[in-house]
Protein backbone atom coordinates (compact mmCIF):
# COMPACT_ATOMS: atom_id res chain seq x y z
CA UNK A 1 0.00 0.00 0.00
CA UNK A 2 1.25 3.46 -0.91
CA UNK A 3 2.90 5.39 1.91
CA UNK A 4 0.72 8.45 1.40
CA UNK A 5 -2.43 6.40 1.60
CA UNK A 6 -1.18 4.80 4.80
CA UNK A 7 -0.62 8.26 6.26
CA UNK A 8 -4.14 9.21 5.22
CA UNK A 9 -5.62 6.20 7.00
CA UNK A 10 -3.59 6.95 10.12
CA UNK A 11 -4.89 10.53 10.15
CA UNK A 12 -8.46 9.27 9.77
CA UNK A 13 -7.97 6.81 12.65
CA UNK A 14 -6.45 9.47 14.93
CA UNK A 15 -9.29 11.87 14.14
CA UNK A 16 -11.89 9.21 14.91
CA UNK A 17 -10.23 8.44 18.24
CA UNK A 18 -10.10 12.14 19.05
CA UNK A 19 -13.80 12.43 18.28
CA UNK A 20 -14.61 9.61 20.68
CA UNK A 21 -12.54 11.21 23.42
CA UNK A 22 -14.06 14.62 22.75
CA UNK A 23 -17.58 13.23 22.90
CA UNK A 24 -16.70 11.56 26.16
CA UNK A 25 -15.60 14.87 27.63
CA UNK A 26 -18.67 16.65 26.33
CA UNK A 27 -20.85 13.99 27.87
CA UNK A 28 -19.21 14.14 31.29
CA UNK A 29 -22.27 16.03 32.41
CA UNK A 30 -24.55 13.27 31.14
CA UNK A 31 -24.53 11.71 34.60
CA UNK A 32 -26.67 14.65 35.62
CA UNK A 33 -29.32 13.43 33.17
CA UNK A 34 -29.46 9.96 34.74
CA UNK A 35 -32.01 11.25 37.23
CA UNK A 36 -34.51 11.09 34.36
CA UNK A 37 -33.58 7.66 32.97
CA UNK A 38 -35.90 5.77 35.32
CA UNK A 39 -38.56 8.45 35.41
CA UNK A 40 -41.28 6.10 34.23
CA UNK A 41 -40.14 3.19 36.36
CA UNK A 42 -39.75 4.90 39.71
CA UNK A 43 -40.77 8.57 39.65
CA UNK A 44 -41.43 8.72 43.38
CA UNK A 45 -37.75 9.22 44.17
CA UNK A 46 -37.03 11.93 41.62
CA UNK A 47 -38.72 14.91 43.25
CA UNK A 48 -39.66 16.18 46.68
CA UNK A 49 -42.54 14.60 48.56
CA UNK A 50 -44.78 17.56 47.77
CA UNK A 51 -44.05 17.43 44.05
CA UNK A 52 -44.63 13.66 43.94
CA UNK A 53 -47.92 13.58 45.80
CA UNK A 54 -49.88 13.63 42.54
CA UNK A 55 -47.86 10.77 41.06
CA UNK A 56 -48.27 8.55 44.13
CA UNK A 57 -52.02 9.14 44.32
CA UNK A 58 -52.44 8.19 40.65
CA UNK A 59 -50.44 4.99 41.04
CA UNK A 60 -52.55 3.88 44.01
CA UNK A 61 -55.76 4.75 42.11
CA UNK A 62 -57.10 6.72 45.04
CA UNK A 63 -60.06 8.83 44.02
CA UNK A 64 -60.43 10.79 47.28
CA UNK A 65 -57.56 12.99 48.34
CA UNK A 66 -56.93 13.98 51.88
CA UNK A 67 -56.84 17.73 52.52
CA UNK A 68 -53.35 19.11 52.32
CA UNK A 69 -51.91 22.55 52.76
CA UNK A 70 -49.36 21.90 50.00
CA UNK A 71 -50.42 22.63 46.43
CA UNK A 72 -49.31 20.27 43.70
CA UNK A 73 -48.74 22.97 41.11
CA UNK A 74 -47.77 26.60 41.02
CA UNK A 75 -50.38 29.12 39.90
CA UNK A 76 -48.80 31.15 37.14
CA UNK A 77 -48.95 34.92 37.26
CA UNK A 78 -50.65 36.59 34.32
CA UNK A 79 -47.33 37.97 33.04
CA UNK A 80 -45.41 34.71 33.42
CA UNK A 81 -42.37 35.00 31.10
CA UNK A 82 -41.49 32.13 28.75
CA UNK A 83 -38.74 29.65 29.57
CA UNK A 84 -36.17 28.91 26.87
CA UNK A 85 -33.73 26.00 26.65
CA UNK A 86 -30.67 26.36 24.43
CA UNK A 87 -28.84 23.05 24.15
CA UNK A 88 -26.35 21.10 22.05
CA UNK A 89 -28.42 18.99 19.65
CA UNK A 90 -25.43 17.05 18.33
CA UNK A 91 -24.56 16.05 21.91
CA UNK A 92 -27.90 14.23 22.27
CA UNK A 93 -29.44 16.68 24.75
CA UNK A 94 -32.83 16.98 23.00
CA UNK A 95 -34.30 14.14 25.05
CA UNK A 96 -33.14 15.82 28.26
CA UNK A 97 -34.82 19.05 27.13
CA UNK A 98 -38.08 17.21 26.48
CA UNK A 99 -37.95 15.64 29.94
CA UNK A 100 -37.30 18.99 31.59
CA UNK A 101 -40.15 20.55 29.60
CA UNK A 102 -42.51 17.80 30.73
CA UNK A 103 -41.81 18.18 34.44
CA UNK A 104 -42.01 21.99 34.18
CA UNK A 105 -45.44 21.78 32.53
CA UNK A 106 -46.58 19.46 35.31
CA UNK A 107 -45.49 21.86 38.04
CA UNK A 108 -46.35 25.09 36.19
CA UNK A 109 -49.47 24.35 34.09
CA UNK A 110 -49.70 26.66 31.09
CA UNK A 111 -46.04 27.68 31.12
CA UNK A 112 -44.60 28.63 27.71
CA UNK A 113 -41.44 26.60 26.96
CA UNK A 114 -39.19 26.83 23.91
CA UNK A 115 -36.15 24.77 22.91
CA UNK A 116 -33.47 25.50 20.32
CA UNK A 117 -30.00 24.44 19.30
CA UNK A 118 -27.14 26.29 20.98
CA UNK A 119 -25.18 27.67 18.03
CA UNK A 120 -21.42 27.10 17.87
CA UNK A 121 -19.08 29.95 17.02
CA UNK A 122 -19.05 31.50 13.56
CA UNK A 123 -15.72 29.93 12.65
CA UNK A 124 -16.93 26.49 13.71
CA UNK A 125 -20.16 26.91 11.75
CA UNK A 126 -18.38 28.04 8.59
CA UNK A 127 -15.81 25.27 8.94
CA UNK A 128 -18.52 22.62 9.27
CA UNK A 129 -20.33 23.97 6.21
CA UNK A 130 -17.16 24.00 4.10
CA UNK A 131 -16.31 20.43 5.13
CA UNK A 132 -19.85 19.35 4.31
CA UNK A 133 -19.65 20.79 0.78
CA UNK A 134 -16.20 19.31 0.17
CA UNK A 135 -17.47 15.95 1.40
CA UNK A 136 -20.34 15.94 -1.08
CA UNK A 137 -18.08 17.00 -3.96
CA UNK A 138 -15.49 14.31 -3.24
CA UNK A 139 -18.08 11.57 -2.82
CA UNK A 140 -19.68 12.53 -6.15
CA UNK A 141 -16.26 12.42 -7.85
CA UNK A 142 -15.42 9.04 -6.32
CA UNK A 143 -18.78 7.45 -7.15
CA UNK A 144 -18.72 8.80 -10.72
CA UNK A 145 -15.12 7.66 -11.17
CA UNK A 146 -13.83 11.08 -12.19
CA UNK A 147 -10.81 12.86 -10.79
CA UNK A 148 -11.09 16.65 -10.32
CA UNK A 149 -7.31 17.12 -10.26
CA UNK A 150 -6.66 17.11 -14.05
CA UNK A 151 -9.23 19.89 -14.41
CA UNK A 152 -7.18 21.92 -11.96
CA UNK A 153 -4.00 21.18 -13.89
CA UNK A 154 -2.71 18.79 -11.24
CA UNK A 155 -1.67 15.17 -11.32
CA UNK A 156 -4.07 12.79 -9.63
CA UNK A 157 -2.54 11.70 -6.28
CA UNK A 158 -1.96 8.02 -5.67
CA UNK A 159 -4.39 7.88 -2.77
CA UNK A 160 -7.17 9.31 -4.96
CA UNK A 161 -6.40 6.74 -7.64
CA UNK A 162 -6.88 4.07 -4.99
CA UNK A 163 -10.18 5.67 -4.02
CA UNK A 164 -11.35 5.56 -7.65
CA UNK A 165 -10.44 1.87 -7.74
CA UNK A 166 -12.36 1.18 -4.50
CA UNK A 167 -15.35 3.47 -4.85
CA UNK A 168 -17.67 2.00 -2.26
CA UNK A 169 -15.07 1.74 0.49
CA UNK A 170 -13.64 5.17 -0.31
CA UNK A 171 -17.06 6.86 -0.34
CA UNK A 172 -17.95 5.29 3.00
CA UNK A 173 -14.60 6.32 4.48
CA UNK A 174 -15.02 9.91 3.24
CA UNK A 175 -18.53 10.06 4.67
CA UNK A 176 -17.53 8.82 8.13
CA UNK A 177 -14.32 10.84 8.27
CA UNK A 178 -15.97 14.13 7.30
CA UNK A 179 -18.94 13.53 9.60
CA UNK A 180 -16.56 13.02 12.51
CA UNK A 181 -14.93 16.39 11.85
CA UNK A 182 -18.30 18.13 11.38
CA UNK A 183 -19.52 16.67 14.67
CA UNK A 184 -16.46 17.96 16.53
CA UNK A 185 -16.98 21.45 15.11
CA UNK A 186 -20.70 21.57 15.92
CA UNK A 187 -20.57 20.07 19.42
CA UNK A 188 -20.69 22.69 22.19
CA UNK A 189 -21.82 20.70 25.24
CA UNK A 190 -24.22 23.52 26.12
CA UNK A 191 -27.43 23.22 28.13
CA UNK A 192 -28.48 26.77 28.97
CA UNK A 193 -31.80 27.78 30.55
CA UNK A 194 -33.32 31.25 30.25
CA UNK A 195 -36.34 33.08 31.56
CA UNK A 196 -36.97 35.72 28.92
CA UNK A 197 -33.44 37.02 28.24
CA UNK A 198 -32.05 36.23 31.71
CA UNK A 199 -29.99 33.07 32.02
CA UNK A 200 -30.81 31.14 35.18
CA UNK A 201 -28.60 28.10 34.52
CA UNK A 202 -25.50 27.43 32.43
CA UNK A 203 -23.97 24.00 31.94
CA UNK A 204 -21.02 25.63 30.18
CA UNK A 205 -20.15 27.50 33.39
CA UNK A 206 -21.34 25.10 36.08
CA UNK A 207 -20.28 21.90 34.29
CA UNK A 208 -23.59 20.15 34.96
CA UNK A 209 -27.33 20.38 34.45
CA UNK A 210 -29.66 21.29 37.33
CA UNK A 211 -31.73 18.78 39.22
CA UNK A 212 -35.51 19.36 38.99
CA UNK A 213 -35.71 20.91 42.50
CA UNK A 214 -32.85 23.28 41.62
CA UNK A 215 -34.62 24.34 38.44
CA UNK A 216 -37.89 24.86 40.32
CA UNK A 217 -36.08 27.00 42.88
CA UNK A 218 -34.38 29.05 40.17
CA UNK A 219 -37.71 29.78 38.49
CA UNK A 220 -39.44 30.56 41.79
CA UNK A 221 -36.57 32.87 42.69
CA UNK A 222 -36.93 34.74 39.41
CA UNK A 223 -40.68 35.10 39.91
CA UNK A 224 -40.14 36.32 43.46
CA UNK A 225 -37.71 38.96 42.20
CA UNK A 226 -40.32 40.13 39.70
CA UNK A 227 -42.77 40.46 42.58
CA UNK A 228 -40.23 42.35 44.68
CA UNK A 229 -39.46 39.45 47.02
CA UNK A 230 -35.80 38.92 46.15
CA UNK A 231 -34.76 39.08 49.79
CA UNK A 232 -36.25 35.68 50.50
CA UNK A 233 -34.14 33.88 47.89
CA UNK A 234 -30.53 33.56 46.83
CA UNK A 235 -29.08 35.26 43.78
CA UNK A 236 -28.73 33.60 40.39
CA UNK A 237 -25.17 32.61 41.26
CA UNK A 238 -26.66 29.83 43.42
CA UNK A 239 -27.99 28.13 40.32
CA UNK A 240 -24.81 27.50 38.37
CA UNK A 241 -23.93 30.93 36.94
CA UNK A 242 -22.35 34.09 38.19
CA UNK A 243 -24.43 37.07 39.13
CA UNK A 244 -22.85 39.18 36.37
UniProtKB/Swiss-Prot annotation:
Entry's Gene Ontology BP terms: cell redox homeostasis
SUPFAM superfamilies: Thioredoxin-like (SSF52833)
Disulfide-linked positions: 88-91
Keywords: Disulfide bond, Redox-active center, Signal
Signal peptide boundaries: 1-22
Keyword Disulfide bond: yes
PANTHER family, per the entry: SELENOPROTEIN T, THIOREDOXIN REDUCTASE-LIKE SELENOPROTEIN T
Family in the record: Belongs to the SelWTH family. SELT subfamily.
UniProt-recorded name of the protein: Putative esophageal gland cell secretory protein 6
Amino acid sequence: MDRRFTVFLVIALVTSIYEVLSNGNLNDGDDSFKQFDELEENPAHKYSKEAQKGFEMEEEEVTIREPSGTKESFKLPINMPPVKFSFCVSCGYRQAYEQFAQILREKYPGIDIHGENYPPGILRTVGAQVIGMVKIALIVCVVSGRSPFPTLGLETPTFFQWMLSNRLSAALMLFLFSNAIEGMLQSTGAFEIYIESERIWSKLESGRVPSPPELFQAIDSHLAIRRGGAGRFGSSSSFGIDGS
